[in-house]
Amino acid sequence: MRKPMFMLFLFVLALAFAACKKEAVRLAYPETKKVDQVDDYFGTKVADPYRWLEDDNAEDTKAWVEAQNAVTFGYLETIPFRPKIKDRLTEIYNYPRYSSPFRAGEYYLFTKNDGLQNQSVYYIQKGLDGTPEVFIDPNELSPDGTVRIGISGISVDDKFVAINRSEAGSDWSEIRVMEIATKTELSDRVRWVKFSGAAWHGDGFYYSGYDEPAAGEELQAKNEYQKVFYHKLGDPQDKDKLVWEDKEHPLRYVNAGTTEDEKWLFLVLSEGTSGSEVWIRDLARANAPFTLLVKGFDYDSYPIEVVDGKVLVHT
């Protein structure tokens, strides 16, 4: 008797579910036009009818995105339990958060988020017992709060800090410099930087960058042949010195680093998300050549420091 009763229970449950189920919402998606675009790759023709969408600055593309967003958010707003989810997430995420502090001479810097700030704020204090003050608040750098910043390097004398600044989620960043003690921003502007820190040496720093893309191609041009430059504080960017370039491998990335005593310059090259090749240059010798330290990209290798004439490498 148990099996028939169980089947009856399932049947009644299915009827109840069917009676309560609302009619599925039918979404009316905007029409996406197709264009007559065909590319010939070594004799193989490939149709690309949506090529026009690659032009993110075109009015047609902007209108298409707005129409798509209208459909998406129009549907999301009909979900009855969505506000409850938002309220609960807001509740559990609303607590103060701090980063570990890092030292710059007699100052300490750290980030803090009061709980619901879009981005954490950089604070500075003098000594361990000093009163924290706002150093940089990225939420105030643009009307929409989408400017992202990150500290990418502190000068050896602890006087200056290099800051990477990106807008609207772009990978492109601009390096600016601030005097730590006065919280004053200098006039330096280093543009067309991607995936790079600032390796300080003397009165300037090394950084990785690309050639300036053509006007209107900033988000479409290929990122090839990343180079390493040296920027001297106070100079315009067109005076920066080219330190490294590789004309044979357009897709390689390169990052520069210096030792604490500023005697050595490291270059870490990569071809993807894993594997790195390491080169080193003696900065105490004028125009010294780069020497290959770790060859190939089979392993991850990251130089740490030079101690007693020996290079410490994390692998």
Can you say where each PLM-predicted feature lies in the sequence?
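Generic N-terminal leader/processing signal
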Residues: 1, 19-20
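Bacterial N-terminal signal peptides that target proteins for export
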Residues: 1-7
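Bacterial N-terminal signal peptides
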Residues: 7-16
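Beta-propeller folds
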Residues: 20-315
